[in-house]
Amino acid sequence: MGIRRRRLSLLAFALLGLAACSKPYVAPVLPSPYREQIDAPYDAVWRALVRALALENIQIGAIARDSGVIASEAVPTTIGLYANCGRFGDTQVEGDVQVAYTIFVQAVSETRTAVQVNTRMRSENYARGSGKARPRPPLACASTGRWEANLLDTVRALLRQ
């Protein structure tokens, strides 16, 4: 009985030692949806938004003009520019991420339109640091907000044409 207890204690101590050496995963803080109001009528914003998505080569999964909803298929991007997937210890997660967008468009008045962009990001092919990215358990990622801001800048530019 004493030898068995000693072996279990040794095993538990070894596992604790291994766990102490691993770096904890720190998830990114998920931002709220990206919201802006555009000084243009609903129909003009809708047309410009659809054109902007086409320019970005975003595949549309569902679109409903009457309810003001556009949902994209998942598109790949690299972690860092548009996505933050957290870190392991002090090392940033690097690799690829799949991003899907849901965009809501709503008239605020005859001359103003509200646009909200929700993002859903997930990485299954990443590296812990600058190593080679490989398939791993999925990580939820957060948007940096850059893609959404660029999209609405493109919408505004198309409205000025």
Please annotate each region the language model reported.
Residues L11-L16:
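Classic N-terminal secretory signal peptides
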Residues S22-Q161:
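Ser/Thr-rich, low-complexity intrinsically disordered terminal regions
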Residues L18-A20:
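C-terminal motif of bacterial Sec signal peptides marking the signal peptidase cleavage site
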Residues M1-L10:
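Bacterial N-terminal signal peptides that target proteins for export
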